[in-house]
């Protein structure tokens, strides 16, 4: 093929016209120090706070300290293959996690990656883990109940959808048990549950997954696990990741329950990270912003207004105390952020009162508005009667001469305490709770022995379901105990009591 010189020049001119000078500018930095899941990077002058940074070998980090001549970054993976002099690239993104229906029934890590061996999660939706909490206009007051299925809580410390209720107590007092029971109790409601395990043993998380699967609760639950063997930065982001997953459902008009188990370990992970980043320590060596650490997380729990879809995110944070000391730094912080707290006591737990809730110092600041009318009606005097019982029981130890009224109050208190006991993983439907509490508060069980209260309850509920199912149905459907239902309930209690006593003789 022969080309004339003028043709060659026209081809070259055409090529020059088509040439695009594409210059790709990348902001890169250099690792100057690495160790303990912390890296210091020189360069990256335009780096954002909380930005995701890419290290060699596919490891990512999060920029937390933006200093004059370097960036302090926490690593979200192993630092084994990262060395001094390595190149670090900016991604321009904040840490994000996958969200949506595909996560239901799965166990994921802090970054939303599956760790249950059930294959990849098919979703194309992602959300930033840090998000500004809904404003005042976007919210609505808490008015719908979130039933835990635990008599002591639903009757005296009611929780509403969109509330933050702290569960606080020493180790081994049944904090996680209350949280798991609450998840199991959502089986017949429309609530999606998220359980965030922070700094727990892998065996414990596996046990919880097994319990939820056995009770058919895993199908509407997501477990976000950042176990004790994981790096502090991964434990730090776990609750925010779980919250982002919950917000996706909340903003689509659904109701979500999220459990943070527990925030004491979360604060410890943040303290370790902050000290390694050379941030100045404050009280108990925690950094100055440890209050903000938890407040920005718990403020994201909300009941959205009808214009925003009316969804809700209810948070149950757990805090572990040391020898019952609730005046320590982290417990007082979280108590002041939440809308109430459920105190669990070791003394009660070891004396056989389980769940070991102390109703005297437990409180729900907004849940009363959410309690169903039937429960409000029957449980109104419960807290007062228990308080009177505790006061009288303390005096009764000293004197044997007690008048009849005092003896009656002590007997009533003993029966209430016995009735509030409940086995683990056996949450009770609210209509059954109402019927049993009605029988106790209206003094129908004064002639039943304290040890017989448990058997009486289980047989009485079976009797009501078999003979008067309409009473439970009415309470469940309307949330009220009307005149007709109350009359039927009174007659049923009297009839069953005769039958129960006859069988015992």
Curated annotation (Swiss-Prot):
Keyword Ion transport: yes
Listed name of the protein: ATP synthase subunit alpha
Function: Produces ATP from ADP in the presence of a proton gradient across the membrane. The alpha chain is a regulatory subunit.
Enzyme class, spelled out: translocase
Amino-acid biosynthesis is among the record's keywords: no
Organism whose genome encodes this protein: Alkaliphilus metalliredigens (strain QYMF)
Binding, ATP: 169-176
Assembly notes: F-type ATPases have 2 components, CF(1) - the catalytic core - and CF(0) - the membrane proton channel. CF(1) has five subunits: alpha(3), beta(3), gamma(1), delta(1), epsilon(1). CF(0) has three main subunits: a(1), b(2) and c(9-12). The alpha and beta chains form an alternating ring which encloses part of the gamma chain. CF(1) is attached to CF(0) by a central stalk formed by the gamma and epsilon chains, while a peripheral stalk is formed by the delta and b chains.
Annotated PROSITE patterns: ATPASE_ALPHA_BETA (PS00152)
Record site: Required for activity: 362
Record-level GO cellular component terms: plasma membrane; proton-transporting ATP synthase complex
Coarse class of the protein's main subcellular location: membrane
Any Pfam family the entry gives: ATP-synt_ab_N
Catalytic activity entry: ATP + H2O + 4 H(+)(in) = ADP + phosphate + 5 H(+)(out)
Keywords assigned by UniProt, alphabetized: ATP synthesis, ATP-binding, Cell membrane, CF(1), Hydrogen ion transport, Ion transport, Membrane, Nucleotide-binding, Translocase, Transport
Membrane topology classification: Peripheral membrane protein
Highest taxon in the source lineage: Bacteria
CDD domains (UniProt xref): ATP-synt_F1_alpha_C, ATP-synt_F1_alpha_N, F1-ATPase_alpha_CD
Family of this protein: Belongs to the ATPase alpha/beta chains family.
Name of the gene encoding the protein in the UniProt record: atpA
One GO MF term: ATP binding
InterPro entries in alphabetical order: ATP_synth_asu-like_sf (IPR023366), ATP_synth_asu_C (IPR000793), ATP_synth_asu_C_sf (IPR038376), ATP_synth_F1_a_nt-bd_dom (IPR033732), ATP_synth_F1_asu (IPR005294), ATPase_a/bsu_AS (IPR020003), ATPase_F1/V1/A1_a/bsu_N (IPR004100), ATPase_F1/V1/A1_a/bsu_N_sf (IPR036121)
Compartmental location: Cell membrane
EC number of the protein: 7.1.2.2
Classification via PANTHER family: ATP SYNTHASE SUBUNIT ALPHA, MITOCHONDRIAL
């Amino acid at each position: 093929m022969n080309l004339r010189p003028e043709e060659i020049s026209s081809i070259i001119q055409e090529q020059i016209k088509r040439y695009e000078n594409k210059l790709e500018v990348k902001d890169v930095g250099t690792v100057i120090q690495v160790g303990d899941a912390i890296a210091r990077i020189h360069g990256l002058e335009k780096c954002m706070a909380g930005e995701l940074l890419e290290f060699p070998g596919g490891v990512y980090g999060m920029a937390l300290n933006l200093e004059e001549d370097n960036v302090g970054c926490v690593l979200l993976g192993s630092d084994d293959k990262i060395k001094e002099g390595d190149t670090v690239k900016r991604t321009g993104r904040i840490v994000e996690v996958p969200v949506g229906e595909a996560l239901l029934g799965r166990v994921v890590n802090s970054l939303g990656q599956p760790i249950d061996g059930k294959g990849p999660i098919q979703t194309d939706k992602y959300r930033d883990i840090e998000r500004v909490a809904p404003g005042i206009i976007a919210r609505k007051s808490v008015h719908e109940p979130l039933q835990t299925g635990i008599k002591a809580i639903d009757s005296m410390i009611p929780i509403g959808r969109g509330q933050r209720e702290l569960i606080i107590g020493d180790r081994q007092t049944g904090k996680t048990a209350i949280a798991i029971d609450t998840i199991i109790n959502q089986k017949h409601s429309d609530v999606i549950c998220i359980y965030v395990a922070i700094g727990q043993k892998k065996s414990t998380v596996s046990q919880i997954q097994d319990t939820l699967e056995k009770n058919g609760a895993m199908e509407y639950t997501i477990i976000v696990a950042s176990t004790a063997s994981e790096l502090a930065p991964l434990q730090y982001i776990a609750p925010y990741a779980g919250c982002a997953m919950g917000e996706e459902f909340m903003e689509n008009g659904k109701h979500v329950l999220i459990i943070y188990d527990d925030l004491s370990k979360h604060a410890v992970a943040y303290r370790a990270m902050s000290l390694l980043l050379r941030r100045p320590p404050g009280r108990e060596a925690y950094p100055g912003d440890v209050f903000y650490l938890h407040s920005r997380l718990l403020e994201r729990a909300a009941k959205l207004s009808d214009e925003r879809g009316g969804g809700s995110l209810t948070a149950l944070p757990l805090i572990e105390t040391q020898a019952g000391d609730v005046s320590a730094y982290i417990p007082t912080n979280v108590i002041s952020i939440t809308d109430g707290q459920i105190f669990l006591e070791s003394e009660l737990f070891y004396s056989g009162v389980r769940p070991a809730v102390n109703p005297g110092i437990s409180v729900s600041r907004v849940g009363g508005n959410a309690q169903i009318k039937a429960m409000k009606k029957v449980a109104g005097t419960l807290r007062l009667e228990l308080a009177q019982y505790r006061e009288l029981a303390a005096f009764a130890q000293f004197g044997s001469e007690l008048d009849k009224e005092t003896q009656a109050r002590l007997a009533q208190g003993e029966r209430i305490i016995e009735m509030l006991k409940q086995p683990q993983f056996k949450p009770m439907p609210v209509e059954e709770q109402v019927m049993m509490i009605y029988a106790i508060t209206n003094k129908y069980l004064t002639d039943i022995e304290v040890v017989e209260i448990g058997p009486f309850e289980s047989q009485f509920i079976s009797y009501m379901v078999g003979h008067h199912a309409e009473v439970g149905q009415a309470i469940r459907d309307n949330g009220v105990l009307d005149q007709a239902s109350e009359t039927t309930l009174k007659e049923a209690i009297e009839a069953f009591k005769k039958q129960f006593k006859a069988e015992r003789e």
